[in-house]
Amino acid sequence: MRAPTTVRCSGRIQRARWRGFLPLVLALLMGTSHAQRDSVGRYEPASRDANRLWRPVGNHPAAAAAKVYSLFREPDAPVPGLSPSEWNQPGQGIPGRLAEAEARRPSRAQQLRRVQSPVQTRRSNPRGQQPPAARTAHSVVRLATPQRPAAARRGRLTGRNVCGGQCCPGWTTSNSTNHCIKPVCQPPCQNRGSCSRPQLCICRSGFRGARCEEVIPEEEFDPQNARPVPRRSVEGAPGPHRSSEARGSLVTRIQPLLPPLPPPPSRTLSQTRPLQQHAGLSRTVRRYPATGTNGQLMSNALPSGPGPELRDSSQQAAHMNHLSHPWGLNLTEKIKKIKVVFTPTICKQTCARGRCANTCEKGDTTTLYSQGGHGHDPKSGFRIYFCQIPCLNGGRCIGRDECWCPANSTGKFCHLPVPQPDREPPGRGSQHRALLEGPLKQSTFTLPLSNQLASVNPSLVKVQMQHPPEASVQIHQVARVRGEVDPVPEDNSVETRASHRPHGSSGHSHWASNSIPARAGEAPRPPPVPSRHYGLLGQCYLSTVNGQCANPLGELTSQEDCCGSVGTSWGVTSCAPCPPRPAFPVIENGQLECPQGYKRLNLSHCQDINECLTLGLCKDSECVNTRGSYLCTCRPGLMLDPSRSRCVSDKAVSMKQGLCYRSMVSGTCTLPLVQRITKQICCCSRVGKAWGSKCEHCPLPGTEAFREICPAGHGYAYSSSDIRLSMRKAEEEELASPVREQRQQSSGPPPGAAERQPLRAATATWIEAETLPDKGDSRAIQITTSAPHLPARVPGDATGRPTPSLPGQGIPEGPAEEQVIPSSDVLVTHGPPGFDPCFAGASNICGPGTCVKLPNGYRCVCSPGYQLHPSQDYCTDDNECLRNPCEGRGRCVNSVGSYSCLCYPGYTLATLGDTQECQDVDECEQPGVCSGGRCSNTEGSYHCECDQGYVMVRRGHCQDINECRHPGTCPDGRCVNSPGSYTCLACEEGYIGQSGNCVDMNECLTPGICAHGRCINMEGSFRCSCEPGYELTPDKKGCRDVDECASRASCPTGLCLNTEGSFTCSACQSGYWVNEDGTACEDLDECAFPGVCPTGVCTNTVGSFSCKDCDRGFRPSPLGNSCEDVDECEGPQNSCLGGECKNTDGSYQCLCPQGFQLANGTVCEDVDECVGEEHCAPHGECLNSPGSFFCLCAPGFASAEGGTRCQDVDECATTEPCLGGHCVNTEGSFNCLCETGFQPAPDSGECVDIDECANDTVCGNHGFCDNTDGSFRCLCDQGFETSPSGWECVDVNECELMLAVCGDALCENVEGSFLCLCASDLEEYDAEEGHCRPRVAGAQRIPEVPTEEQAAGLTGMECYAEHNGGPPCSQILGQNSTQAECCSTQGARWGETCDPCPSEDSVEFSELCPSGQGYIPVEGAWTFGQAMYTDADECILFGPALCQNGRCLNTVPGYICLCNPGYHYDAVSRKCQDHNECQDLACENGECVNTEGSFHCFCSPPLILDLSGQRCVNSTSSSEDFPDHDIHMDICWKKVTNDVCSQPLRGHHTTYTECCCQDGEAWSQQCALCPPRSSEVYAQLCNVARIEAEREAGIHFRPGYEYGPGPDDLPETLYGPDGAPFYNYLGPEDTVPEPPFSNTASHLGDNTPILEPPLQPSELQPPAIQNPLASFEGLQAEECGILNGCENGRCVRVREGYTCDCFEGFQLDTALMACVDVNECEDLNGAARLCAHGHCENTEGSYRCHCSPGYVAEPGPPHCAAKE
């Protein structure tokens, strides 16, 4: 860059130039002197009415400095100094004019002395007084005007950045397009930098500056002062574009009011002023080892020193430069007072009877004022702090402009690192920490400050509010209080710059903590690029389960703060999963991506995220921030739970065991458990009430003692395996604190040397060695080294006693274990007796090491990273870089006590213990590398091979080819480019393809379109404009006739008929007729017709008429269209009491009914027929009734002739009471003459069958007795037959019946069989040949071994019956049958393959069953080498499959089925099927209902069932004399002994249900036994829960009752030991169930506890439901007059008949007269939707809720809540 040249011009030219510039200069001075600066770099007048004069170029911080590169002019503003002809002069563009103006500019030094912005003037003058020279200085401003876009000449501009038909200032069109998307940078970017936005250059690595004109020198990190130092260039020459003259001008710029000073030496300047490596938007990222311990990837350009000031050590060091605030800080330091408007919510916990509940109450809106950074309201207990500055690196705001910094940072914003050790001293920060401790709870909010000047990025203030722990706070507004701004001295003014935030920043992101103001002579650094979530705060979720976000944080955060730390999902209105993050910092497309645990500080820095600032991260524990993560630590006596985020007491995992007592009364423990358990298992469950040998009472829930042993609440306990126990060593902060205190009081070496490595607890073994060959008695101490990286530990003496700690160390002694100490030589010194060199006044005589006293001197034990000086008297730094630890992959930088590797690009730093090395980075593993191609990793780099559809660009990346740029790609459609390809899409309706684009189609050219209207073409469509009488169709593409009849306005009193374009009226209503033109119905005058209203006056009305002034005896009708007679018999004034009033014209008469007589002409009195006459004698009593009488007949008589006399009831003719006998009617009764085999019943007198088979001796031992009506029969066994009398079984003599059955052998009859005997003992009988043959000589014949095929047939397999239309092998007869047993009996198929049995006439059947059907071989029985066969007992082979509902009886061959009563045998199914008695038995006057094995007759009132049970007859008395419950009542027996009933219930009879469910054990004259009280039948009969059955079956939604009275009970398993319900198992009734009745427990034995109804919260009590059928007694199924006996309900008899009282969950279907299930999931009439956050499943009589992922079931009303 050449030096500026001063050009002399003539006075005319200068006057002309100043004449053109004078208005602009005056406007500049007048406008900016009172201008307010906003956050986008614009100067605006203080008055709102003043016009905006000008604005600097761009919206970056370059506009804030005094150096102005160019100005944009407004579209209609003239350019000063140039005429319109010169402005538009062809052939000479704006760059040429600028070059000419540049040539006429004065020198840079002159310009800087003449042009000063108000901001720099205030910064440069400490007192804020502007000298007259500065006020009257003239401004020389260089102008630049954007070129007119070339696209304006090609056609209309579209898209963004278009202003008034041309590109907006700062933008131009890209090549071959009409879009203003190309930014303009003037002057252009240098050194191959790219123009990202107007006047914003993105620099390549190694360059910086507003135009990338400077080269960044390489810098090293100096740990002494924690700031980077530029490396000296070769020969000390300055970088490009930087000369000594230029440096001199820099100093002149900073100090404009001082005389010019000579330029300082370049070497001194480079050493004392740190350069900005990350100036501009350079992509250079250099990571240096952070001096802090949190692992922050800090910038190497951080300002050093404790405060925000930076002093220059050059010749101008006497002048102080005040640093401006970091980027993004608005002008809020002048605010003295703010107000905070918030609403507190007070929550309190109330406990009653062992249960605690939280009650919250919202308070009033409260306003607190913060004066001087903090405010306090002593009445409400609230305290607030606010900060106008962001506290970085985990710092906390504790007052106005005051940050409390953690141990690893310092400075005003906590933006500076501090040297090691990493933990802060105990005394540091105690002054401010005391403000944050105490009983109050603290909440932190980062909010924008309202009531301030308009700005793009409003000021963010951090408000910390201390409030009572039971309160929560919601802040509504943080506002600045006007009129409370104090004047600020000029030296403390802030240079306001354009504020931008990096990617992902929000109100919580302190991204600008490490920024440095621009150096003198440089353009200020541009701000970071705004992110896509600029200024956006959302909800952070800690867990994501199956796509559902859960566990949200209690405060709003930005996406980067959330996803970079502990969050898994983030969003504002809907959550989205966090994107993946790289393993190390990566810059792609100008954006910096930070690894997990870090966030962007600016475009080139990643800063560690302090997760400990997140509320509620470590519950009840202390959060410690670490590098890229965090840890939760606990106090002594506490430990982390399995979640590693909460501290629990050691008592929660105690393994001490003792007895657990289930009851504790008056300090006495009873009911101990058998097994010893821990206290937390005993007390955390609901079982134990006390524990231990001392009977320690379990703490109540909700108390602190309960939370100590049960931190997870009721039902949960920790085990020692869940929590990893660890010994707690002394913290580094505790070990290092005495060292810091020692050094604070001494003046020893600088603190950076000895504090490089933290002290760790270690042990050592000291061995006394032999005497050294030195003078005196000095002894040497040999140190055994095994771990050289641990610091020294002061040993104990030879006897094992601990040696006192050395000063400056303060390390407590540990156990006597092996000590690990690095060895060194021994330095022996002499001194007077008692002289201790280690305590001779020096704080640390050895420096970074440990001084060890020897008998005659001392020695130094150096710390790791240090070595003994050659003089052997102190420790010095060890230069590890001489050993090349970085192995050529990076540059080694030695530091005091350590070293670091600065890895080259393509390598990453790996730390292994205390060593560092550079490893190759596999760039191909990073997402997005080589997108559209294949990545190949190389040593230190990588390269891409592009796929088809991609092309390699300049930087080695693959870029998609946009095929749609070619017009011929999609000639007939629309081209859509995609990564690596493209797609041709058909044009939408209304468009046609033309050269790759879709153009509009003119549908109006189509003939016949828009009939009855006019066609109007539109973009992509068309519409019709209709003629009068027509309207548009819904799609607006046609015209249709308007139906005038659709509106009631046409023919409202008639029938409207629509026509094309018109309508007509017809069929007018009564009282109207059609007018002449037929378009309306007019009123008809009915009074004009004769005969209307003959007894009154006719009055015409619209559409009708009325009759008025009726004659006497008449009145107007209700319709008013006639006069009607007055009926005197109506109304309450009826004169005929007890009789019928008959109306006449003008009068009436009384007619009395039969049995009444008229008295006084108006009253009908009853005639008493029973007086003086005996109408019902002699078998009845006369009872008078109103208007009649009836006879009350004696038993055995019935009323006749309408109840006027009594006649005998012929029971023999009506009911047939004598079944099996002859009925003889008597006067008022009857007698039964029973036939043989019947006897009269003692209770009813009817003839009942005598069961002869009750005597076991009947039929003898060889038969089975089968009882029949009036007799019996004997069914004899095989070989026996019935005797002639039929009452016994006698043996059959086969030898007599079967002639020659034994052939030539002798036949001998035996009991039930016979034998064939040969005459000679040398012969034996052959059953197959039927004669005797000689015996085999020597021995009996050996049976033949069956073949393999025969053996397979002897294997037991499945036997199948005939399928009868179903699948062939679906009916199994037996599981283990041989083929002969199956196929010779009832089987049809056999075996694993279900092979069919052979037919009876086949050879296979003859071989399988030689003896025929029904005979099987005897296993193991052989005679003369042949198998013996016997009859197959089908009842044994196929017992379960035969004769179901009956008894199987074997015969020879075959079997018979003896079916139970009510069943008949079905030969097809081989079972006893139910016999439908209703088909052949007439249920007279009633309804017959068939049941399984029986039937029932049901009668309708007033009929009742007679004693035969098959006929419905009239009751012998009136219905009033027989209540509903008197049907089928009998004696109830209280005791049954040996099947004999005794102790009948005296006083009244009961029903079967009432007897068995109360105290009875049997019922009726037949002594019918009641079911056992522990059986399921009893539970169903008496409507009680069966405890044992419920425990076996688990939890049921409904009890198993069916009929009978009783409340709606729930099984006992729904209740705990104390009677309290388990809310986790509540069904869908939405109410807490009541426990079973206490009186039912008396039937369960003495050991069953009686359950008491628990205390229920009022909000859970169900409302009282009044059941109108609750007072009726439930009937048994056989007693019910409804089909199926009211399943899912109870049958009750009411006066109208029978009905069903349905159980809960069912409703009565009156059409089916049955209880059907209620689908609760479709019932939308409830108070709240069922199963919120889940889906509802309907079940029989109930429903279930299935919660969605991330939700769990909640007690109370059925809904699902988010999982915590």
Curated annotation (Swiss-Prot):
<keyword id="KW-1015">Disulfide bond</keyword>
<feature type="disulfide bond">
    <location>
        <begin position="563"/>
        <end position="578"/>
    </location>
</feature>
<keyword id="KW-0379">Hydroxylation</keyword>
<feature type="disulfide bond">
    <location>
        <begin position="1176"/>
        <end position="1191"/>
    </location>
</feature>
<feature type="disulfide bond">
    <location>
        <begin position="903"/>
        <end position="918"/>
    </location>
</feature>
<feature type="disulfide bond">
    <location>
        <begin position="987"/>
        <end position="998"/>
    </location>
</feature>
<feature type="disulfide bond">
    <location>
        <begin position="1026"/>
        <end position="1039"/>
    </location>
</feature>
<feature type="disulfide bond">
    <location>
        <begin position="1435"/>
        <end position="1448"/>
    </location>
</feature>
<keyword id="KW-0358">Heparin-binding</keyword>
<feature type="disulfide bond">
    <location>
        <begin position="1218"/>
        <end position="1232"/>
    </location>
</feature>
<feature type="disulfide bond">
    <location>
        <begin position="189"/>
        <end position="201"/>
    </location>
</feature>
<dbReference type="GO" id="GO:0043279">
    <property type="term" value="P:response to alkaloid"/>
</dbReference>
<feature type="region of interest" description="Disordered">
    <location>
        <begin position="80"/>
        <end position="140"/>
    </location>
</feature>
<dbReference type="GO" id="GO:0019838">
    <property type="term" value="F:growth factor binding"/>
</dbReference>
<feature type="glycosylation site" description="N-linked (GlcNAc...) asparagine">
    <location>
        <position position="408"/>
    </location>
</feature>
<feature type="region of interest" description="Disordered">
    <location>
        <begin position="220"/>
        <end position="279"/>
    </location>
</feature>
<feature type="domain" description="EGF-like 1">
    <location>
        <begin position="181"/>
        <end position="213"/>
    </location>
</feature>
<feature type="domain" description="EGF-like 2">
    <location>
        <begin position="383"/>
        <end position="415"/>
    </location>
</feature>
<feature type="disulfide bond">
    <location>
        <begin position="886"/>
        <end position="901"/>
    </location>
</feature>
<dbReference type="InterPro" id="IPR049883">
    <property type="entry name" value="NOTCH1_EGF-like"/>
</dbReference>
<feature type="disulfide bond">
    <location>
        <begin position="1234"/>
        <end position="1247"/>
    </location>
</feature>
<feature type="region of interest" description="C-terminal domain">
    <location>
        <begin position="1585"/>
        <end position="1764"/>
    </location>
</feature>
<dbReference type="InterPro" id="IPR000742">
    <property type="entry name" value="EGF-like_dom"/>
</dbReference>
<feature type="domain" description="TB 3">
    <location>
        <begin position="1357"/>
        <end position="1409"/>
    </location>
</feature>
<feature type="domain" description="EGF-like 8; calcium-binding">
    <location>
        <begin position="1000"/>
        <end position="1040"/>
    </location>
</feature>
<feature type="region of interest" description="Disordered">
    <location>
        <begin position="484"/>
        <end position="529"/>
    </location>
</feature>
<feature type="domain" description="TB 1">
    <location>
        <begin position="538"/>
        <end position="590"/>
    </location>
</feature>
<feature type="disulfide bond">
    <location>
        <begin position="1170"/>
        <end position="1182"/>
    </location>
</feature>
<feature type="disulfide bond">
    <location>
        <begin position="634"/>
        <end position="647"/>
    </location>
</feature>
<dbReference type="GO" id="GO:0097435">
    <property type="term" value="P:supramolecular fiber organization"/>
</dbReference>
<dbReference type="InterPro" id="IPR050751">
    <property type="entry name" value="ECM_structural_protein"/>
</dbReference>
<dbReference type="GO" id="GO:0007179">
    <property type="term" value="P:transforming growth factor beta receptor signaling pathway"/>
</dbReference>
<feature type="disulfide bond">
    <location>
        <begin position="185"/>
        <end position="195"/>
    </location>
</feature>
<feature type="disulfide bond">
    <location>
        <begin position="405"/>
        <end position="414"/>
    </location>
</feature>
<feature type="disulfide bond">
    <location>
        <begin position="1556"/>
        <end position="1570"/>
    </location>
</feature>
<feature type="disulfide bond">
    <location>
        <begin position="1087"/>
        <end position="1098"/>
    </location>
</feature>
<keyword id="KW-0340">Growth factor binding</keyword>
<feature type="disulfide bond">
    <location>
        <begin position="838"/>
        <end position="851"/>
    </location>
</feature>
<feature type="disulfide bond">
    <location>
        <begin position="391"/>
        <end position="403"/>
    </location>
</feature>
<feature type="disulfide bond">
    <location>
        <begin position="1532"/>
        <end position="1555"/>
    </location>
</feature>
<feature type="disulfide bond">
    <location>
        <begin position="1541"/>
        <end position="1567"/>
    </location>
</feature>
<feature type="disulfide bond">
    <location>
        <begin position="924"/>
        <end position="935"/>
    </location>
</feature>
